[in-house]
Structures are given as structure tokens and as C-alpha cells.
Amino acid sequence: MLHLHHSWLCFRSWLAGMLSVLLGLVPSASSNISTSRPNILLLMADDLGIGDIGCYGNNTMRTPNIDRLAEDGVKLTQHISAASLCTPSRAAFLTGRYPVRSGMVSSIGYRVLQWTGASGGLPTNETTFAKILKEKGYATGLIGKWHLGLNCESASDHCHHPLHHGFDHFYGMPFSLMGDCAHWELSEKRVNLEQKLNFLFQVLALVALTLVAGKLTHLIPVSWTPVIWSALWAVLLLTGSYFVGALIVHAGCLLMRNHTITEQPMRFQKTTPLILQEVASFLKRNKHGPFLLFVSFLHVHIPLITMENFLGKSLHGLYGDNVEEMDWMVGQILDTLDMEGLTNSTLIYFTSDHGGSLENQLGRTQYGGWNGIYKGGKGMGGWEGGIRVPGIFRWPGVLPAGQVIGEPTSLMDVFPTVVQLAGGEVPQDRVIDGQDLLPLLLGTAQHSDHEFLMHYCEGFLHAARWHQRDRTTWKVHFVTPVFQPEGAGACYGRKVCPCFGEKVLHHDPPLLFDLSRDPSETHVLTPASEPVFYQVMERVQRAVREHQRTLSPVPLQLDRLGNIWRPWLQPSCGPFPLCWCLREDGPQ
């Protein structure tokens, strides 16, 4: 027996030695990471629903290029945006922090930046991952949508410009696409402004007529001065109501290259080729790396600008055409990487800034996305349909192909992940809410580092998620929007559901869902149906209190003072509103 035991010990020692030698000869993924810094390509869609993509369950929309990323990489199925609208979500993405920390929220209903000529924007004291990567020697570029502010005190100070937030190069829209850019019926601003101007015109016209009648009949002792002024203002308001659509197009629908306006207003038939041309140029120019390129697609936000060769090709109308065109754009970018020999040295990430819009509807025609099995959509801070988004990472030879991860992750996680990959350090002077995803992506960790995630609507906490490891994921809703009509799952007749006021419900006790068994949030749990109801509520409430203690008061960038149009802040390539320029000719 002793002889057998001794032989077994010898064999085990020999086996351990051989394994050590073999492991020393075979480089691991983690050792590859430690010895090389990848190029980083971030792709973000605008308003894309998680159910719009083939690899997330859509079998009628053709997205072969995005699907290929998932086949060759890692797909996240519980990937969460920090906000359900673009401005706060993008601020959180770039900084790794809840938007309430940077003040990129509102308390009065102005949930995104409303104008290019507003003073609000991503504060200059916020640190983006682009700033850190630039300091680490990366060439940094942003192509596409910004929508995080531009100017503070003058039309040329560009205090919120991407070039002041760590990007070496910018080409795209400082603002955002909107229905008004194409004079759509689905208008974000024009219709509302026309109604206000017409109302004020009627009031002033009535005042002027009353004063005239009173003066002529000697019933109102008044001079002609107030009569003339009220009549003049009435005429100006009437004129403004007729031209407000054109003013909005010139004010917001423009393209910039770095600090220079290149198109005002934009020629949409050339926009997609221009974006692709710019991406290819950046990749070729910086192929010796390392580089960080953030491609922030204008797709699939209304007015769904689509090239002629994609019109009518999908099974889902103009929205489907636009999604399929965006997927084609992804394919063109992947082809450029292949041609430049950059595929294996580039980490690619694909996502959307939030869920698809359900309220983008005219008659029976839907112009917004599909959020699959998840309740709600764009603008709803708590429901999964507004915040659960695609999340795909691909890095050939490093990340396992075809991997699917169901752990809770966040858009905010991109910040610490790319900073770590670049050899940088996450700031220690502020709270960073994102977590490094590398251990999860590589398979060296089985669980997400997010135990809790908070779900805000503007500055109001609507819900919280508790990931109870090895058990389940709980979701607690404190506030939910009132759907119109009741049970419709959306707020039809409005642009988005509100965050506060009469059109929301405050729940006491809060609503509880088990997302692991009920991802569609259809079965509300009660103390009678869930034995640990009170324990879950107590633990989540405690986590909320702990989170709130980490918040500090900051100026709200999206409130009224920072979110009104100021003529002296309006970027223009000529005297506004008589501005028109075309400084670059796109592909023919």
C-alpha cells in the first residue's frame, strides 16, 4: 500500500510538472491582454430596440452583420442602459456614472437637451474614457451623434464639444436627428412651438383689437404706443409660427468637422456615405494604433433617413429599412477592419443607447423599435423595454466566440473596461458606477460585480434591481407611468411617458418582480405569493438609501436655465437664420 501511495505521489508530481510546462508554452487570453493594448471600436445605435436584431430573437429583420459579431464574440442578454433617453444615457456611457451624478438630468420634464444653442451639457469636470485613453497615447475619435451640449457663453466657446472631452477628432451632429429635420408629422419641437406661437398671437391680437376699439370709442384712455406694440408683436408671432419649422432645421440639423460647420442644414441623401467615408478614413489614418473610435449612429432615430437602395426592402416599413441599412453600415465598417488588417487587434462593442420608441406611431404605422418580450420602451425609466439593450463584444482570439452571458451588466461598465484595457486607471476622486467586464467576458468570473442597479427617470428613482447571486434577480418598482390607453404598454398621444406628476403611479408597497422567472414583468409578486417579499423589500430599500448617500448636489444641466434656446449660443456658418453652407462634397 505504501508503495502504491508513493507511486501515485510521483505520478501526480510528474503530471503537475508537465502541465506547468505546457501552460507556460501556451499563451492565455489574459496574458495576451497584459502584453498588448487593443484598438477599441464602439458602435452605438440610436433608439434601437433589443428585439430588432436577429441574434436577440428577431426572425423577420435582416441583421447579418450584427449577428456575426454575436456569433464571433460574447452576447450580453441583461445589458442595461443608465437612462431611457439619449442625453442622460450617453453621459453615463462616457463617464461610467449615473447621469444624476453629473447633473445630466432634469426635474421639470426637459429630459434631453432641446437645442444646439442651449448652455447645458456634459460638465467639463467630468472625466470620459476618451480623456483617459488619450492620455495613454490612444488616437481618439467620435463620428456621428453627440447630443451632450456645445456652448456655454458664446457661439464659439465649444465648452461641451467632444474635443473638450477627450476626443482628438469629431465628425457628425453636435445635436441629434429629429422628426423636424425632415418636416415630419412626428415632430419633437415644431408642432408644440407653432401651437404656443399661435396662442400668443391670438392673445396679443385680441389685446390690440380691444385697445383699438377702446380708444376709438373713448372707453379706454390709452395712447397709440401700446396699441402699435401689441399689434407689432402679434405680427411677429404670426410670422414666426410660419417659419419656425425652417428655423428649427437650420438651428439643429447640421454637421461639424471638429470645430467647423460643414453642412447647415444637412443634405440627408449624403449623410450615410459621409459617415462611412469618415469612419474608413479614421481607421486607415490610425491603423498603426492604438485607437479608440466611437461610432455613434444616427440610425434608427426618426425621421429614419434611409438611402434609396434600402427603401421598401424590409418587412417592417421605413423603420425596418433603416435598421437593415444600419446593419449594412456595420458590415462596411467590419470590411474596412479586415482590409486594413485590424480585425484581430480590435475590440468591438455594439449596443443601443436605450430601448425602442413605442410612441413613434402615425395611424397604424409604427416608426419605432420593438423591445421583444420586455414591457415598455424609450422614456420609461424602470420598465425593461426602456433600458434593456443589446450588448455584444468581439475580440478574435481573446474573447470566446458564441458565448452568452445573462448576468446584469451596464453601459456604464464600458468605462472601466476600456480604461483597464488601455493601461489606464479609473479615477479615485469620484464614484464610478460601472464595473470592469473583462473577468466576466473572459470567463474567469461567473458573476457580475453589480449587486444592485438603480433605474432613474430624470432625477427620480423609479426602480431598483437586486442581483442575488446563485439565486435570482429581483426588480422593485417604486414609480411607474400611467399607460394611455390603459393597458396599452405605452403612452400613446405623447412623445414619451412622464417621470412625475399626475401621469405616474407611486406604489406602496412597491411592485416586485422576479426577472429570472418573469423577464416580461407580467406577474406582480405579493407577500402572499412570495415568502421572502419583505426581506427583498428591506434589502433593496437599504441599498437605495446607501446609494443616495453617495450622491452630491450638482447643477442640473437639463433644467430650464440650461435648456432654453439662446441666440448668442447658436452655431451658424452665417448670420442666423440666413445661414447656409456646404463645405464638403460627399461621395457620388
From Swiss-Prot:
Main subcellular localisation: Golgi
Family matches, as SUPFAM superfamilies: Alkaline phosphatase-like
EC number(s) on file: 3.1.6.1
Disulphide bond pairs: none
Modifications made to the protein after synthesis: The conversion to 3-oxoalanine (also known as C-formylglycine, FGly), of a serine or cysteine residue in prokaryotes and of a cysteine residue in eukaryotes, is critical for catalytic activity.
Gene3D superfamilies attached to this UniProt entry: 3.30.1120.10, Alkaline Phosphatase, subunit A (3.40.720.10), Helix hairpin bin (1.10.287.550)
Coiled-coil intervals, chain numbering: none
Signal peptide (from-to): 1-31
Enzyme class, broadest EC rank: hydrolase
UniProt binding sites for substrate: K145, H301, K378
GO cellular component assignments: Golgi apparatus; Golgi stack
Co-factor binding details: Binds 1 Ca(2+) ion per subunit.
InterPro entries referenced in this protein's UniProt entry, alphabetically: Alkaline_phosphatase_core_sf, Sulfatase, Sulfatase_CS, Sulfatase_N
Pfam families to which the protein is assigned, alphabetical: Sulfatase (PF00884), Sulfatase_C (PF14707)
Keywords of the record: Calcium, Glycoprotein, Golgi apparatus, Hydrolase, Metal-binding, Signal
Cofactor annotation: Ca(2+)
Residues at the catalytic site: C86 (nucleophile), H147
Residues modified as 3-oxoalanine (Cys): C86
Protein location: Golgi apparatus, Golgi stack
Sequence positions that bind Ca(2+): D46, D47, C86, D353, H354
Positions annotated with a glycan in the UniProt record: N32, N58, N125, N258, N344
GO molecular function: arylsulfatase activity; metal ion binding
Function per UniProt: Exhibits arylsulfatase activity towards the artificial substrate 4-methylumbelliferyl sulfate. May be essential for the correct composition of cartilage and bone matrix during development. Has no activity toward steroid sulfates.
Protein name stated in the entry: Arylsulfatase L
Source organism of the structure: Macaca fascicularis (Crab-eating macaque)
